[in-house]
UniProtKB/Swiss-Prot annotation:
InterPro entries: Ammonium/urea_transptr, Urea_transporter. Inhibited by phloretin and para-chloromercuribenzene sulfonate. Detected in erythrocytes (at protein level). Expressed in spleen erythroblasts and tumoral kidney. Mediates the transport of urea driven by a concentration gradient across the cell membrane of erythrocytes. Also mediates the transport of urea across the cell membrane of the renal inner medullary collecting duct which is critical to the urinary concentrating mechanism. Facilitates water transport in erythrocytes. It catalyses: urea(in) = urea(out). This is Urea transporter 1. Homotrimer; each subunit contains a pore through which urea permeates. Identified in a complex with STOM. The lineage of its organism: Eukaryota, Metazoa, Chordata, Craniata, Vertebrata. The record marks 339 as: Important for channel permeability. Belongs to the urea transporter family. Keywords: Blood group antigen, Cell membrane, Glycoprotein, Membrane, Transmembrane, Transmembrane helix, Transport. PANTHER family: UREA TRANSPORTER, UREA TRANSPORTER 1.
Length: 389
């Protein structure tokens, strides 16, 4: 990502009284400073690493790539997300990490924009590819031969990303997780459930009406499905993992964390409104696409105002309903819906035009995180008022 707020360092002189010295950074004053260093997009760390060994820079790129799945450009958040994946399943964490590494190396070999690589934008799609290939593998955990197709499909992600960016940049639109959707759909279509080497889990369409009893609805399970919905962005159904992911998002941006939770909640509401099987709702299948959509529209690619906040809620609901339609459609050919609903719905909302000045689409080159995006929007609005011509 691009700009971030400038951190101002204030050093107080050391006070010497006899033999006692008072540190310039003590207790409560030091903590906010340290916290400010690890929040947002940690641009200061990226700048400090520019003259450091390339191995340290590469680790930073990988961690940012892991966190960019949820639009977070923060290596500490990447560490937390990796911890969450380890809590869910160490094998999934390994395949996701491997996919990110291979994709980032491939982007370097293809001489892609170094600033985009450093922000993790050539790694996050392969993170999902690696994790979801393990999730959908019918061979179970630690099927080591799976690492070969994980590497192969991860290498396609920078190609998809670069090609899609060439097209979508004409409208100043992001590629989102379209490369992941393309790569995973291609892999699952080529292998399928009956492949002797790399069989995938069987995806079948619904052929009978679900037996819904509203008296069986559990408020506790619905509450747990909020973090589970966020966790399902990475294919995880553990509520503790989802909670760790929310914490990782919170570290970078409280506004993003809020919209992630709201989006998951709206997905649950959409599922209940269509009498979806409770197991699907508890499993987070109704929450992850709407959570991504709510984050994207709620301050990330649209400057946050009350108007865009309401637009984000509408986009989240629209995404949830589109998701069940696409899931039913794609199940006919044995494929999961992945994050196709999020990509298509959110791109549709971003393309939308309006004369309302409070609905402001962020220039893609200026997108950082919601709090900083809003500062940019207010400054741009002030400049327009001061010099309308």
């Amino acid at each position: 990502m691009e700009d971030s707020p400038t951190m101002v360092r204030v050093d107080s002189p050391t006070m010497v009284r006899g033999e006692n010295q008072v540190s310039p950074c003590q207790g409560r004053r030091c903590f906010p400073k340290a916290l400010g260093y690890v929040t947002g997009d940690m641009k200061e760390l990226a700048n400090q690493l520019k003259d450091k060994p390339v191995v340290l820079q590469f680790i930073d790129w990988i961690l940012r790539g892991i966190s960019q799945v949820v639009f977070v450009n923060n290596p500490v958040s990447g560490i937390l997300i990796l911890v969450g994946l380890l809590v869910q399943n160490p094998w999934w964490a390994l395949t996701g990490w491997l996919g990110t590494v291979v994709s980032t190396l491939m982007a370097l070999l293809l001489s892609q924009d170094r600033s985009l690589i450093a922000s993790g934008l050539y790694g996050y799609n392969a993170t999902l590819v690696g994790v979801l290939m393990a999730v959908f593998s019918d061979k179970g955990d630690y099927f080591w031969w799976l690492l070969l197709p994980v590497c192969a499909m991860s290498m396609t992600c920078p190609i998809f990303s670069s090609a899609l960016n060439s097209m979508l940049s004409k409208w100043d639109l992001p590629v989102f997780t379209l490369p992941f959707n393309m790569a995973l759909s291609m892999y699952l279509s080529a292998t399928g459930h009956y492949n002797p080497f790399f069989p995938a889990k069987l995806v079948i369409p619904i052929t009978t009406a679900p037996n819904i009893s509203w008296s069986d609805l559990s408020a506790l399970e619905l509450l747990k499905s909020i973090p589970v919905g966020v966790g399902q962005i990475y294919g995880c159904d553990n509520p503790w993992t989802g909670g760790i992911f929310l914490g990782a998002i919170l570290l970078s941006s409280p506004l993003m964390c809020l919209h992630a939770a709201i989006g998951s909640l709206l997905g649950i509401a959409a599922g209940l409104s269509l009498s979806a099987p409770f197991e699907d709702i508890y499993f987070g299948l109704w929450g992850f696409n709407s959570s991504l959509a709510c984050i994207a529209m709620g301050g990330m690619f649209m400057a946050l105002t009350w108007q865009t906040h309401l637009l984000a809620l509408g986009c989240a609901l629209f995404t949830a309903y589109l998701g069940v339609g696409m899931a039913n459609f794609m199940a006919e050919v044995g494929l999961p819906a992945c994050t196709w609903p999020f990509c298509l719905a959110t791109l549709l909302f971003l393309i939308m035009t309006t004369k309302n000045s409070n609905i402001y689409k962020m220039p893609l080159s200026k997108v950082t995180y919601p709090e900083e995006n809003r500062i940019f929007y207010l400054q741009a609005k002030k400049r327009m008022v001061e010099s309308p011509l």
